């Protein structure tokens, strides 16, 4: 799956079956996916979140509903489609999902997740749970999630998924205490193999995990995101090391 990553130049990210499997195990547990669930395939097929829509549903026995192109940005049409088809779970890019959550009630929906860019503070919807998700393609879709249950002046990205560990380090690779800002490092079963035909770039941002040699956690990915741990264990993104701006995920 191709991603611009930290350079702005598209790179082929080599995701493995094990990466997706680890994510789908977490997806089932966190969202309560079962045979009664109906998942909306809303994300673009060029966006890694489409793998969540597709594999998260079909590996757990849920129905998958591909959203018609003509209603993707029609909130009234989308709400009608969700309720007529009993859609229980949906993902949208951050600003689209935020606007939907602010404007639309939806009795069938249980979870609306958003991701791809920083979430502007807002009040959560009353009918369904609103999830702020974070994760680079290199670590398979989501790395953290946070339930927005009230108005937060600066919305955290949450805590690590089941098969992921996170560190925040300084420029020398030393782990930092809560409150201190540094680069967010990601390790675990969701970290991908590296970049297709780019061994030098792979070696630069996929390095040996100096803090944990547990099987599945031997490699850590340098996200390029500056973050800090909050006192409650949630993570807050501060910015980018390279000042990169994300547009439409």
Regions found by a protein language model. Name each.
Residues 11-40, 48-88, 146:
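Conserved AMP-binding/adenylation subdomain of ANL enzymes
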Residues 14, 38-40, 46, 52, ...:
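Short, well-ordered beta-strand segments
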Residues 59-63, 85-91, 97-156, 165:
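Gly/Ser/Thr-rich phosphate-binding loop
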Residues 1-12:
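Conserved adenylation A10 loop of the ANL superfamily
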Residues 18, 95, 117-118, 189-190:
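Alpha-helix/helix-capping structural signal
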Residues 1, 20, 131-132, 147-248:
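AMP-dependent adenylate-forming
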Residues 34-36, 41, 51, 83, ...:
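His-Asp-centered acyl/peptidyl-transfer active-site segments
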Residues 43-47, 70, 137, 188:
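Conserved AMP-binding
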């Amino acid at each position: 799956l191709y991603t611009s990553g930290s350079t702005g130049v598209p790179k082929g990210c080599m995701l493995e079956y094990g990466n997706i499997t680890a994510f789908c195990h977490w997806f089932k547990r966190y969202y309560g996916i079962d045979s009664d669930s109906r998942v909306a395939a809303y994300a673009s097929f060029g966006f890694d979140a489409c793998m969540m829509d597709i594999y998260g549903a079909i590996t757990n026995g849920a129905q998958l509903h591909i959203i018609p192109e003509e209603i993707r940005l029609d909130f009234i049409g989308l709400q009608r489609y969700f309720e007529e088809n009993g859609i229980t779970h949906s993902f949208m890019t951050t600003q689209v999902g935020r606007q939907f959550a602010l404007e639309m009630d939806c009795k069938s929906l249980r979870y609306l997740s958003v991701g791809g860019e920083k979430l502007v503070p807002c009040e959560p919807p009353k009918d369904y749970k609103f999830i702020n998700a974070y994760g680079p393609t290199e670590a398979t879709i989501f790395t953290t999630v946070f339930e927005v249950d009230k108005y937060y002046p600066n919305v955290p990205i949450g805590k690590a998924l089941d098969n992921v560990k996170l560190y925040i380090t300084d420029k020398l690779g030393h782990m930092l205490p809560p409150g201190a800002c540094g680069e967010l490092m990601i390790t675990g079963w969701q970290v991908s193999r590296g970049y297709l035909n780019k061994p030098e770039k792979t070696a630069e941002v996929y390095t040996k995990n100096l803090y944990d040699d547990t099987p599945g956690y031997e490699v850590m990915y340098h996200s390029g995101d500056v973050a800090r741990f909050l006192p409650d264990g949630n993570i807050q993104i501060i910015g980018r090391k390279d000042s990169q701006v994300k547009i439409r995920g």
